[in-house]
Amino acid sequence: MYKKLILTVALGIAAVSAYAGGYVTNSNQNVAYLRNPAQNAVIGVQGAYFNPAGIGFMENGWHIALDVQTALQRRYTTSTYEPLKYGIDNEGRGYKKYTGKSFVPALPHLDLAYKHNNWFGSFHFGVISGGGKAKYDQGLGSFEAPVAMIPALINTLAGATAVTAYDADINLTGEQYNFAGQLNFGYRINKNWSVSAGVRMNYLSNYYVGSLKNIRLQPAGGQMMPAAAVLASAISSLTGGTVPADQIAPMASQLVSDKALDAHQKDIAWTPIISVDYKTGKFNFSARYEFNTKVRLDNTTKENSTGISQFDDGKQIAADIPGNLNLGAQYSVKPNFRVALGFNYYFDKQSKQYNNETGLNDKQNYLKHNSFEILGGMEYDVCKLLTLSIGANSNTFGFGNDARFISDMSYSTSSISGGIGAQFHVNSRINIDLGVYKTFFLHFTKEQKDYGANGELIYRKLAPVVSQLPLSPEIAGKLTPENLAITGQDDFYRTSIVAGVGVSFSF
């Protein structure tokens, strides 16, 4: 079976990022993060994103940093669903492993800061969420399962193996980006305190183009045929032949008709940001709060025959960026040795997300608790030309046992990450940064009593047809959501590594 699915992996979840933080956040906004993710209390030009108030403790003048990062990621979803055994290429197995591959060769970031005495300002540009593409050569379970359900249904109703295999052509291309520019202004109150306020402009743009076509079924002892013909024949036999197959054919065609999608979603949203920095002796403490960002994606849809309301033309879709609180501390053990800690808390449950199941902006209610992140790292100045650094962080997501918030199209799992790198001091005003950041994701299994809600889906499609046919009570009794539901599960796992190089100037 030929299936090719190209899908951007980001809703919150971002093919190009190391995916630290909330489900829509790329935290690797400067290469310094790769070599030491504990950047919350940093005093440097990268503070334009991580610690805007800390800019107040830099030297007077201009400070600029540019970097480019390269990301490699793999996503592995193992779907266990009994009807998958009918897949022409699945060799009778009721499970299948889907692998998504993503490679982003160059992802740039810019940081700019200016300080004059007590006054200062900063600017940051980067892809805050989304970006990149993931290629799934074998499709995804959520796309294949509804097709797999068709032979399973026919065989159940027939009480025998009437259909032995299925095939289909599935294509989907998706892209999700949030290009963001962040501007902050601040004032150093005294030698200890500095404050800053700013705003981030987010330009969000999502594209989805795809289709489900040419569903085919293989009758027992026969060859692959159009699904509508096989289905019409099967339904006719269930009526005892009282309704001819050619009379049922139009209804059967609707049940297995081709589906297509061509949609563009976009919005411009604003994130207010406030931060404070307290510096005393060898210690530096920071706090940054980003307010919840109201996002209402406007749909411009050329075609949507999928039945997924999220892509209806003219509809507004809630996709808020969660507010988050970021705390940091840095301690200079010696003049050439520093340690840092950080804590990030994301208010995921308070940010509205569109829910296809209810048609309301309430998907966030599926979350068990908000996500959070713990970070730590250290830096050592080997000599006046070289600084070495290392760090790690862990993040925890509150998906809960049923994990209804995530799917094989959009997910991340709790993880532990580590970064290592170096900064080369060309002179007192020019530095070169190198960093590598590796994430070790945990497996997460999502159990489903009705896998992909396919039982409910098939029931809704069949109900209008069944009501027009003289079926026996025994057969009609099998066509309920409860009887059509088949249990299944998805096991989610990812790998990710990011490397980058950057240069910074002061003048």
Give, region by region, the residue ranges found by the protein language model.
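Gram-negative bacterial Sec-dependent N-terminal signal peptides
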Residues: 1-20
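Intrinsic disorder/low-complexity segments enriched in polar/small residues
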Residues: 4-5, 83, 183
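General helical structural elements
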Residues: 7-8, 39, 204
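A general structural signal for short secondary-structure junctions and capping/turn motifs
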Residues: 11, 55-57, 112, 266, ...
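N-terminal, post-signal peptide beta-strand-biased segments of exported outer-membrane/organellar beta-barrel
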Residues: 16-130, 414, 437
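Outer-membrane beta-barrel porins/channels
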Residues: 21-34, 43, 107, 115-507
